[in-house]
Amino acid sequence: MEPISHLVKSSLPNYLSSLPVPDSIGGWFKLSFKDWLALIPPTVVVAGLGYTAYLAYCPAARASCAAKNSGRCNNHIRKNEPKVVDMIDVEDIAEKAAFCRCWKTKNWPYCDGSHGEHNKQTGDNVGPIVIKK
């Protein structure tokens, strides 16, 4: 318990009092590069705490996180149907056709390259199914 007491009563107040926080708005423009570097760690801590509080207490943030972590693949294609199934006759394919597997395409069931952006954002490697005649 002694180390925590020392941190709260001595180390942290000494650190905060040594930060180069100016008294006026004009003082911010007179800070040196070294002063700006000294202000980075507390700024990162405050921003991290603010972001954590935002995720914890903002309903919009919780809803978007829940949607991303739901495990659902299809987020917008024919949601009124219990199961999305497309039957395509091989005889109707001219030479080759690329079919979507990532559910991001706007031209369902054909691939329009939307998986490229998905792969960049998530580090995934999904691609289309290509059928040749």
From Swiss-Prot:
Bilayer-crossing regions: 36-58
Q: Does the keyword Iron apply?
A: yes
List residues binding [2Fe-2S] cluster: 100, 102, 111, 115
Gene3D superfamilies listed in its UniProt record? CDGSH iron-sulfur domain, mitoNEET-type
Topology class, membrane: Single-pass membrane protein
Q: How is the cofactor bound?
A: Binds 1 [2Fe-2S] cluster.
> What's a single GO BP term from this record?
intracellular iron ion homeostasis
Q: Which residues lie on this side of the membrane: Lumenal?
A: 1-35
Question: Which cofactor is recorded for it?
Answer: [2Fe-2S] cluster
Q: What is this protein called?
A: CDGSH iron-sulfur domain protein
